[in-house]
């Protein structure tokens, strides 16, 4: 058995005493990814998606990215995003939504800066 323990002295990176909050967790099945949807954004939350199986295409902020199993997609608050169903093959994902995230040097509910690729 391998065990890892957190250090007793931990300095959080969160600004202004805010503590991020998990809003939702979803499992997106293969069948769901085959249906057309519209690009959308979340003004008040960050969304993280983990590609469990398959491959396809995903649009984030007007850029189309090839995605495959093992990829993580970061959708900062306010950024347009969604799948491109016609290019998806056996795609399933896990998704979480987080709010109240404030990291130094970034807008609220942003995990990465705009110049970093979200995949």
Range-by-range predicted roles:
Residues 78-101, 109:
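Ligand-binding loop in jelly-roll beta-barrel domains
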Residues 100-119:
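Alpha-helical bundle regulatory/interaction domains
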Residues 1-68, 72, 79, 87, ...:
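Generic protein-terminus/edge-of-domain signal
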Residues 27, 95-97, 118:
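Structural signal for conserved beta-strand scaffold positions within catalytic alpha/beta enzyme cores
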């Amino acid at each position: 058995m391998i065990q890892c323990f957190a250090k007793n002295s931990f300095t959080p990176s969160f600004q202004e005493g805010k503590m991020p909050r998990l809003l939702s967790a979803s499992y997106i099945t293969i069948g769901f990814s085959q249906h057309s949807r519209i690009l959308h954004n979340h003004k008040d939350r960050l969304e993280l998606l983990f590609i469990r199986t398959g491959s396809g295409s995903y649009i984030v902020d007007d850029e189309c990215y090839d995605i495959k199993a093992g990829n993580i997609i970061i959708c900062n608050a306010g950024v347009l995003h969604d799948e491109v169903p016609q290019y998806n093959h056996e795609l399933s994902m896990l998704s979480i939504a987080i709010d109240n995230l404030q990291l130094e040097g970034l807008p609220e509910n942003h995990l990465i800066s705009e110049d970093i690729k979200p995949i």
